[in-house]
């Protein structure tokens, strides 16, 4: 018997109206849950059910090719519980029917979370599987307040307090609930002594209940650079098309740091935010037979996006092979250090730069170490950056002059 998936989507939210359908990262929030269920590969599409009281929700959700069940009026009020809804929904199924409840308000839950949780349920003797996350703030630091505003439960709480000595605590994050009809209706709960806690990391466990929660999730998705790279592929492809110059014989391949660089007889193909990986995908489209030289200064965005150091090594090798096959002369720069950036660390940049230095030496490629004049004590110089990653005008001017000197020096070799 195949499992079924149930996605509740009542329309009457008072705290955040229509929260289940609010557009999030280009699609209604409910689609993040529907798509995760589909992509998990654990259900037939017809066995993914949205339970709603809204004809508009129904019409939109059907666009995903799944099933929609309209709730009875008495199950559409804010007094109706999840148990009431599930008891009614499961009434026509066999007692051993396995089901998964996915709440729309956990839009960051991934397809592989669903798959892993279901595989555990199927292979172990448990009543239920429910997703849990670790509590950030220990309840030992919580208190009630007296009428006068005193923290009466906290007296002496900081004496010898060491967070690392506290036992980790976990809470159900609302993302995944798995059971079967007989067990759930008997217990009237997903929580028994035999409920297995499927642990999910904090970054996937945000629950949307208020406007502040929704804004938090928007911010999380905005700073998911892997998603942004995927969504921006068309943007970069169009960008390279706009920059295309069939007659160019010398080209600059870079990101935002090289956009302002102007070298005589060089055509600049730099784009802000682009990764080496994305540039590689597009390179065959603008690498004409006229190109004889390439100046490459790229790589930090790959680290920010989440590519491993080894993947970046591999992509540099692919770039070298492609340019070498076309008998194109190359010159590279190291990757500039950053300063106080959460998304990238200089230890990884140093690993890549050391690898680039050895690689360029072995293949007789001229290499310019831009950190010689941009860094201080192993970091990007504070006076040369606007945000720890991007350059000030002073840095851009310095880069321009050093690039020009480098090109001129290589000419004389």
Curated annotation (Swiss-Prot):
Protein name per the record: N-acylneuraminate cytidylyltransferase
Role noted for this protein: Catalyzes the formation of CMP-N-acetylneuraminic acid (CMP-NeuNAc), which is essential for the formation of the capsule.
Catalytic class of the enzyme: transferase
One of the Pfam families matching this protein, by short name: Lipase_GDSL_2
Any single biological process term in GO: polysaccharide biosynthetic process
Entry's localization field: Cytoplasm
Cross-referenced Gene3D superfamilies: SGNH hydrolase, Spore Coat Polysaccharide Biosynthesis Protein SpsA, Chain A
Highest taxon in the source lineage: Bacteria
Catalyzed reaction equations: an N-acylneuraminate + CTP = a CMP-N-acyl-beta-neuraminate + diphosphate
A GO CC annotation given for this chain: cytoplasm
Cofactors named for this entry: Mg(2+); Mn(2+)
Gene Ontology molecular-function annotations: N-acylneuraminate cytidylyltransferase activity
Family, similarity comment: Belongs to the CMP-NeuNAc synthase family.
Record key words, sorted: Capsule biogenesis/degradation, Cytoplasm, Exopolysaccharide synthesis, Magnesium, Manganese, Nucleotidyltransferase, Transferase
UniProt main location, coarse: cytoplasm
Gene expressing this chain: neuA
EC number: 2.7.7.43
């Amino acid at each position: 018997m195949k499992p079924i998936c149930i996605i509740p989507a009542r329309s009457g939210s008072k705290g955040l109206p229509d929260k289940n359908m609010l557009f999030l990262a280009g699609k209604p929030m409910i689609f993040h849950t529907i798509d995760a269920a589909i992509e998990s590969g654990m259900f037939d599409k017809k066995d993914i059910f949205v339970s709603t009281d809204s004809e508009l929700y129904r019409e939109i959700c059907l666009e995903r090719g799944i099933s929609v069940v309209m709730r009875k009026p008495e199950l559409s009020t804010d007094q109706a519980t999840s148990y009431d809804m599930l008891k009614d929904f499961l009434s026509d199924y066999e007692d051993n029917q396995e089901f998964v409840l996915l709440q729309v308000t956990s839009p960051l839950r991934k397809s592989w979370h669903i798959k892993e949780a279901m595989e555990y349920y199927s292979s172990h003797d448990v009543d239920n599987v429910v997703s849990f996350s670790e509590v950030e703030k220990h309840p030992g630091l919580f208190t009630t307040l007296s009428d006068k505003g005193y923290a009466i439960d906290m007296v002496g709480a900081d004496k010898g307090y060491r967070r690392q000595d506290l036992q980790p605590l976990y809470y159900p994050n609302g993302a995944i609930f798995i059971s079967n009809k007989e067990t759930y209706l008997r217990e009237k709960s997903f929580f028994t002594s035999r409920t297995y806690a499927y642990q999910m990391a904090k970054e996937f466990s945000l629950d949307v209940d208020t406007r502040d929660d929704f804004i938090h999730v928007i911010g999380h998705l905005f700073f998911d650079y892997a998603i942004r790279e995927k969504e921006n592929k068309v943007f970069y492809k169009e960008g390279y098309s706009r920059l295309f110059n069939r007659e160019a014989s010398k080209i600059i391949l870079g990101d935002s740091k090289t956009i302002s660089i102007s070298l005589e007889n060089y055509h600049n193909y730099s784009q802000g935010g682009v990764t080496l990986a994305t540039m590689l995908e597009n390179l065959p489209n603008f690498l004409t037979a006229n190109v004889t030289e390439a100046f490459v200064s790229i790589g930090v965005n790959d680290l920010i996006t989440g590519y491993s150091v080894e993947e970046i090594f591999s992509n540099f090798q692919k770039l070298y092979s492609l340019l070498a096959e076309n008998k194109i002369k190359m010159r590279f720069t190291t990757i500039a250090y950053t300063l106080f950036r959460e998304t990238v660390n200089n230890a990884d940049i140093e690993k890549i730069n050391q690898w680039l230095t050895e690689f360029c030496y072995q293949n007789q490629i001229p290499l310019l170490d831009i950190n010689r004049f941009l860094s201080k004590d192993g970091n990007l110089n504070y006076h040369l950056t606007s945000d720890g990653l991007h350059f000030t005008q002073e840095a851009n001017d310095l880069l321009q002059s050093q690039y020009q000197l480098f090109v001129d020096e290589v000419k004389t070799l």
